[in-house]
Structures are given as C-alpha cells and as structure tokens.
C-alpha cells in the first residue's frame, strides 16, 4: 500500500468519524463530546444503535444480549449493496461501509450535500429506533414472542382454491409476509433465476460439511425455496403456503410478526444466502481459484469511482447489487441516477486545506438484472420515528443507461455541461416569466397583462358626475338611514364632485353619528340601488387623456403578451432540448426493460406490499397481491407506483437487460425442439413432490364432492313435503300481472291503480254514453296515457318521484318501446279486480280479449319481461335506499351500510342502461361513504378505550364491515371523495403506530393493519343482501317523500 493510499484512507476515516459525531449531535441535541464519542465506540460505528442508546439516556456500553440482538439484525452491507465475498480488496474505498450507516436511518442528515445517500426504508434497526423513542427496549422485547396469526383464511370449499388452467399461482400471506410474496414472485418470473433455483443441487458432501451458521441456514432454505418454486410451477392450487421458507427467514432476521419486513433488506438477505449457497456448489464443481457464482453474475455489477480528495486524484472499482437511489427532490428516475452518479464536495477535517474534492461514478459492468432501491423513508427528528416520502417519481418502461457507462464518460460530460448551461438559462427565463405573471410590490401579486387590462377597463368606464355617497343617501331616504358598513371610505371614493359636502356643522355630519349603532341586515338595508354604477370609474378625464391612456395601455398590453408568449415558447423549447439530449443513436445502445415494480402502501412503520410483474410471453402486466393474481395495465401500475397521489408508491424497481434474452427465454426439449412447460421443467425429485401435493388436493376435491352429494340428498328428502305443499298452493293462486304487484294485500292496487282506472273509465263512459265497451276502452286508454305522459314530463322536487306511482311513468321516461307500453296499459284495464265493478266488467273483458289477440311477434316477450324486471329492481332499490337512509338517521350505521351497499349496486346496474333507470348515484355514494367513515370512527374509539371487549368489538367492525367493503370505494371511476375517505380511514389507524400502547393492542393492530392497507380491489367478503319486508306502493311513496324531505332540510355540509 502506498503512502498516498494511507493518507487518503486516514483522511476518509477521520471525515467519517467527524460526520458521524455531527449527525449524532444534530439528531439527539447532545453536545457533550465525551458522551458522543462513547456512543460511537459502543455502537461500533452504527448510527442507528448510537441514536437508540443516546435517546434511551444510556451512553454506556449496553448489555451484551441487547447488542447481540441489534448486530445480528444488521445485514452486512456497503454503500452500494452487499458484495459479500466478492468485494475487491486492497483498494481505496471512500464510499463504502462508512457512509452506509449514515443514510440507512436518516435521509435528512446530509441535506447540505448533493450526494443522495442510500436508504433502504424500514429496516429492523430503524424500527428499533422508533420503538426506543416510543417505549423502553424491554417493553418491546416482550412483543417478540407471539404466535403467528394468518391474515388469510382458507375457504372451506376447495374449488375456491383451485387453480385455473395456466393461471399464475399466488402466495398465501401467513402473517405480515406480503413483502415475501412481492419479492419471491418478482424473482420467480425471471425464467433464468427460476431455472437456477429449480436445478440447484446441494453439495454432495453436504452431510460431512461443518455445520456453521450459514450452512445450517442456507441449505434448508434452498430446499424449501426449490419446493416453493416447484409448487408455483405445477400446483393445482390457486395459491400455495410459503410458511416453511418464511420461518427460516424470520429466524435469521431475529424479528417478529409485529414488524413489517423491509423489501430491500429482505431482497439483500435473500441474494446473500443464494450467493453463499451457489458458492458452496461452485467451489465443489471447479478447482479454479475464483469459481463463477451464477447469482453474482446475474445480480451484481461494477462501477468505477473517479475523483479528487484534497487535491489528490483517485480511482476505485467497486461491486454493487441493488443500487440505492434517493427520491426526495427528484421528479424522475434519471434525475435520481444523475444525482447518485455525481457527488459534490467531499468534506475535509482540515479546514485550512484548499484542495478541491469530489467524485463521479461510472458503470463499467452492468448486471443482467438491475435492481434500484427507491429510498422513500426519512427520519423525523421531532416525532422520533421514520416517515414515508410520498413524492411523485416517474420511471420509464425502457431505461437507457448509456449516459452512465464508463466508455461514454467523455460525451456524457459534454452533454451534462450543455444541460447545466441550458438549465441555468432556463432558470433566468423562468424568473423573467415570473415577473410578468406575478407583478406587484405588495403581498398580493397579479399577472401584468391583467393589471393593464383592469386599468384599461377602469379608464374606459363611464364617469359619474355625482358622489356615490349622495346617490346612496338620495335613493335610501325613503327607507331610513343606511348602516355605516355600506358607505365607501371617503378617502378612497370621494372625488371633486363630493367636495361640496357640508363640513362638521352640516346636517349630514350630524346624521352620520347614529349610523354606527344601526344593526346590519344582509340583503335588506345594504342592497345596492339599481341606478348605482357597478364599477368605480374616473371622475374627470378628457377625451384626449382617455385616448392617449387607452393607446398606451393597449400597446403595453400587446407588448407584455408577446413577451410572455416568447418566454413560454423559449422555456418549452429548452425543456424539449434537454429531454432529447440523450436520444441520439449512440446513447440508446444499452436498453433495460422494466420487469417488476414492488409497491408499498402505508406509512413507515406499517403497510402492505404487492408487485406488478411483466408477463413477457403475453406482453402484459400482472398484479401479484398475495393470493390474488390479476391482469393489470401500465395505467394502473402508474397510478399505484409513481406516488404523489395516494399512500402507495414504488419501493423497488427491477430492470432486466433487454438484450439478454436468456433471462426470459423458455427452455426447449433438445430432442423435439418443443418448449418445456409446467411439470416438464421440473427435475424428477421436484416433479414427484408436486404430484404428491396435487394428489392430496384432488383427494380433498373428491371428499368435498362426496359431502355435497350427501348434503344435497338429505336436503331433497327434507324438502319433498314442503315442495308438494308449495305446488298445491300455487295451483290455487290467481294469475296476476307483473310480479312486483304481487303483495300480500291488494289494497295497494285499489288505492293507486284501481282508483285511477275507475276514474278514467267513468269519465270515458260519461263522454261516450251511447258507445260500446270497446270504444270506451280506447278513450279510457288515451285519457290514462295522456295523464301518465304529463306526470312523466313534470318537473318535480326530489321528494316526489312519479316513477314510484306508476310503472308506465318509469317506462315513458326511459323511452320503452311503444308495444310494451300498450301491452302494459291493456293489462291495467284487464285486471281481474275490475270485475267487481259493474261499469268496468265489460271493459275488462274487452281488454283481456285484446291481450289474448297480441301475437308473439308483435311484442318481444323477453324484452317485455326485462322491462318489468328492471322496474321491480328499481322499486327494490328504492326500498333499500329508504331503509338505509332511515337507519343512517337513527345512527344505526351497520344496518344502514348493508342496505346502502345493495342500493348502490342495484342502482349502478340500472343507471348503466339509462340515466332515468335509477336514483341519484351521488346521493347513494355519499351516504355509503359516510356510513363507512362513521363506522371507522366508532371502531377507532372502541380501540382507543383499551378495554378488551371494546377493542374486540372495534376490530370486529373493521374486519366485518370496513375491510371487506373498502374496495367498493376503489373500483369503478374511483371518485376523489371516495379515495380521500379511504386514505382518512387508513391514516387514522396508521397514526396509532407512533403511540404508546399495551403489547396486546400493538399485536392486534399489527395483525389488522395489512388487511386495511391492502390496495386490492378484490372483494374479500360480502354479506347476503338484507331481506326486504312486504310493502305497498302507497307506503313506498310516503316513506320516500318523508326521507327525501328530511334530507333536503339537512345543511349542505352535513350531507
């Protein structure tokens, strides 16, 4: 090692130590140098532990057991991700492990530096900090020992768990393991990685190897991972259980189920284990000094750090795996990468050293699979816990990395200088434009064009020759004195025309005194007289002055508009130039295609993970959300992953070399040349394992079928007597009209239909006394139809809906076919209940005869039945709505919710056929949303009480009514109010994470939160629609009018 290298390394170590102490001082507020030095020594240079020790007011060496726990949880890492045994030795490392400790917990710690430090989110260490700040370490260690509770429960019906043909397989969430599912599915869908895992064979002398900790852990994990991958390939189940692999991982993390595992940390640990496992195998199969490790070749690349430290140049080659990127302060992935590749000034402990320091990073070798960690967490010093950054960050489907390659460094430097020059010029232009768009010297600023326009309008207004005060006094003399509030300030409004007003001794002056005591009544005393000008105007201006002023203002306004337009066009051109700076052919030779996006929703201490993975065979995006695997789209991915809109955002991006087709290429049979699919891709031992599992599942299906057959037979035997009784009663029932009229009581028909029918028949009979029943029938039908058309066209208040009074009003408003309307009218006049009235008997007979004469080709019976079925659904929807709103007003929110959910679903189906088929969708949506918010509030209050019974009741409300129905607010058009309501409910529960609470409450909260934060739009449970009681049309109309009137009296902000 050279003297220069010694100097550089010592300088770097001193720099890191001083930076470490500065950070501790900033975070904890402790200025005692001895305490800080002691914390540095006790934590072995680990910032998280030092913060925890100092915050706990214990700067002495902690007990060995505590230290062991934290250090075991710490993954071995350098600044750019684990290199393991593959790291280069004997090189100058100015950016290695030293800085990684700084950036993992606190992104704000180096705000003065342009370099984006690595954050990996909610690691075990960061959660340890949070727990120390919230309670003592001893209290939280009690939470570590508990039984895992499954988030998902298997359906008893195995057919619900049966895999559709060739459908992707999900992974069961076995207790806060959505992080495991997201990462494993992303890697499994890399066919090369899948092949490596499936075809892995442990070393032949594995039984004879010394069982150190790594080998004791890695070999069982590889066995379970192979089994898991084999099931994902060939199982007949919709989803599989990863419990055995997860348990091995959890043991290594020394974690507990109450913590949400961090995707980056887990991926890092997983690749470390895989690297170790394949290294053992590689060393057995080759005698080379450095055997090739397929995991290293797949996931690890190299970069060259070039720079100057205190005036001395250096170069350092390092290996990297997952590449960390800072999100805060950047709008897209390229900006993050640019900041990561160029580091500004490197601080020096020697303040008198004037030598410049800085460095650049250039990729020399990119891995086939390139993973970016998006650092979305920062440490909030005030709250004492990590917080999530929800800023929007865009990323492309194809990422060109030519500009970051070492071989392109010269042309990239030139382009960076050009971009810097353009951005500097852009800043100047934007500042100039801002002066035009925000003009003024006071706190309120306006566009200069508008200022000139307002001045022009004022100058052009018609002058007023009398004082506005005089006008008001004259116009209001009949109605008494005006309140002082309505008088304009004389210093502002009173011009030369008002100078003749009397002085202090005048009557006007004396009359002004009582005006102060007059009570101001809006819309009465202060009403503006109709002859008063609406806008101020200049009192005196000559034609010449006005002409000159208008000319100047017009000219200036045109000049400003031209200048503004020129600036905006120049800014747009510069933006476009910057965007296209790297679009030339030489800079699009290294394409990487987006393979997977790992998404996190929630806050720093808890949340839910899922993955979007590109199906290269079908060329479409798939969403992997635990057991649910669904088709998706780029638009949905963007909505959930870019951030800035909801609490969901991308946390990890996995790109693959677009030219490395072996990553996604299927395996082929060497003899037949056919692609191997499914079980054909599995080695014999795994094929046997999957077949055995499939046989167990098929047996479960057979047993279920047998149980169903036995149950069905028993039900038929029990139902036979009831069926015979029902058939007997059906034969005696009278044949009626549409089934929505079949109520237990016929009084409804007599009040609504019969009375009106009798009235029109009486009128038609009176007008046509000497005519036969057929003529009277035709006249009565015309009269009734005219009445119904008038009702359908009438503009009514919300409480009056004539569609509920008569089916034909509903048909007319929705433009039903003429033949259907005619047939329904004939059924009204042919109703058998009219036979009891002597005047109507013959007319009823004629109507029935005409009904029988209608041929099937004249009226489409299916369409006819469909229209009447829709009307029945409309009436049922109305009853659901009425009952739901009545329960809401009684504050019976659970019952209200169930009825409103049915009303919303039925109404949605009706409105899909026409705008007048159902009720106001916004009204139902509003009260459905309010029900969920009210129930969430009730559940939260019960949880906050801390009483076991209340806590359980609160969680029952959440699990039974909130969690299953939240997805209903996130489907369809996703109204902004619904999305905000969901966010409010989730944030309410996430806020408890930062509060002190009993261990059992913490346990229940952590079990419940992943279900609440699940972004899936899959409905996980739905109650049977509540049964509606028998009701009459009269009752329906009355209750509808009553509830709608009560709503109209509710203030707008209460609805």
Swiss-Prot record:
Disrupted gene: phenotype observed: USP25-deficient mice are more susceptible to various viral infections including H5N1 or HHV-1 compared with the wild-type mice. In addition, loss of USP25 protects the liver from oxidative stress-induced injury. Knockout mice have increased seizure susceptibility.
Induction: Induced by type I interferons (IFNA and IFNB1) produced in response to lipopolysaccharide (LPS) and viral infection (HIV-1 and SeV viruses) (at protein level).
Cross-link (Glycyl lysine isopeptide (Lys-Gly) (interchain with G-Cter in SUMO)): 99
Motif Required for SUMO paralog-specific binding per record, residues: 89-95
Coiled-coil regions, chain positions: none
Single GO MF annotation: cysteine-type deubiquitinase activity
Domain UIM: 97-116, 123-140
Residues of the active site: 178 (nucleophile), 608 (proton acceptor)
Compartments, as annotated in UniProt: Cytoplasm; Nucleus
CDD domains assigned to the protein according to its UniProt record, in alphabetical order: Peptidase_C19I, UBA_UBP25, USP25_C
Low complexity bias: start-end ranges: 474-489
Residue location of crosslink Glycyl lysine isopeptide (Lys-Gly) (interchain with G-Cter in ubiquitin): 99
Function: Deubiquitinating enzyme that hydrolyzes ubiquitin moieties conjugated to substrates and thus, functions in various biological processes including inflammation, immune response. Modulates the Wnt/beta-catenin pathway by deubiquitinating and stabilizing tankyrases TNKS1 and TNKS2. Regulates KEAP1-NRF2 axis in the defense against oxidative assaults by deubiquitinating KEAP1 and protecting it from degradation leading to degradation of the NRF2 transcription factor that is responsible for mounting an anti-oxidation gene expression program. The muscle-specific isoform (USP25m) may have a role in the regulation of muscular differentiation and function.
Protein name according to UniProt: Ubiquitin carboxyl-terminal hydrolase 25
Organism this protein belongs to: Mus musculus
